[in-house]
Regions:
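Short histidine/acidic/glycine/proline-rich micro-motifs that form metal-
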Residues: 14-16, 53-55, 126-130, 157-158
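Active-site neighborhood of HAD-like aspartate-dependent phosphohydrolases
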Residues: 1-49
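Short acidic alpha-helix initiation/capping motifs at coil-to-helix transition points
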Residues: 19-29, 59-71, 129-130
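Short, acidic loop-to-helix structural element flanking the phosphoryl-transfer center
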Residues: 62-66, 82-85, 92-124
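A metal-dependent, Asp-based hydrolase signature
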Residues: 45-93
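Asp-based, Mg2+/Mn2+-dependent phosphohydrolase catalytic module
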Residues: 1-6, 113-116, 127-130, 135-255
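Short coil/loop linkers at secondary-structure junctions
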Residues: 37, 77-81, 145, 178
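Alpha-helical elements of Rossmann-like donor-binding domains used by nucleotide-donor carbohydrate transfer enzymes
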Residues: 25-29, 46, 70, 110, ...
Length: 255
């Protein structure tokens, strides 16, 4: 069976960035939209806690709902709709300024174009902690927003995060593909490679450690991944650069 769909991670796979610096810059830009509800320190803690709530989401609500419900907890004056409106204005007006904090991986767009030209579906399997509006802005940063991508996972169409295998089950259901038809590629040896628990082929993308810096959220994801690893056996089928990924994909033979 040949590969019919490539699922590929985004952060530190298609773009490189310093996670903690990004989070601080994000908070600085977003805080002015909610100054009438929180002081700056409280806002940052709310932001972090609500993001972690998405990472640990159990499927009972979308990740976006998990974020907002946690963010407004203990703040009766801020309701669900108003909170979402404030963040939407931020994403529409200021979020684009964070594009300068990422470095585009040079071969990413070319790889995806070649994959699409070969008739293989492409899914941007980014950890879904951003809403759709922000996620598509991030695709523009990577210069891939114009490509015919089948699906991009985001906080509004997902109820789990990586490394939970349920994230991959949901994704495969949306694109109507079996695990055997799909290849998952990304830089994280557990969060991305956990797709193998479903029977997907996996490819570990080499990370430029000098440019891509992991931070507090990745550490929390890593802790979650270690817990998941006790439930499932993960496998790495191949590894290398994005160029190596292309060669592996186009010369794939299922063992």
């Amino acid at each position: 069976m040949t590969i019919k769909a490539l699922l590929i991670d985004f952060d530190n796979t298609l773009v490189l960035f310093n996670e903690d610096q990004f989070l601080v810059a994000y908070a600085k830009l977003a805080y002015p939209y909610l100054t009438d509800f929180f002081d700056e320190a409280t806002f940052f803690q709310k932001l972090l806690q609500s993001t972690l709530q998405m990472i640990h989401n159990d499927g009972s609500q979308t990740n976006a709902e998990a974020f907002t419900n946690n963010f407004i907890a203990d703040t009766p004056s801020l309701d669900f709709e108003e909170c979402n409106n404030r963040f939407r204005h931020f994403y529409e007006e200021k979020f684009h300024e964070l594009g300068d904090t990422v470095i585009v991986v040079p071969y990413g767009r070319e790889l995806l174009k070649r994959v699409l030209d070969a008739g293989i579906q492409v899914v941007i399997a980014t950890n879904p902690i951003f809403p759709e509006l922000a996620t598509h802005a991030r695709l523009r940063w990577a210069n891939i927003a114009d490509l015919n991508i089948t699906l991009t996972t985001h906080a509004e169409n997902m109820s789990y995060c990586k490394p939970h295998p349920e994230y991959y089950q949901t994704t495969l259901g949306l694109i109507q593909r079996s695990p055997e038809e799909c290849l998952m590629a990304g830089n994280d040896p557990i969060s991305d490679m956990s797709a193998s628990a479903l029977g997907m082929t996996t490819f570990l993308v080499d990370l430029d450690q000098e440019k891509g810096r992991l931070g507090i959220l990745s550490k929390e994801i890593g802790n979650s991944a270690k817990k998941e690893a006790k439930r499932f056996q993960y496998r790495i089928d191949a590894s290398g650069s994005l160029e190596d990924l292309e060669h592996f994909l186009f010369n794939f033979e299922r063992r």
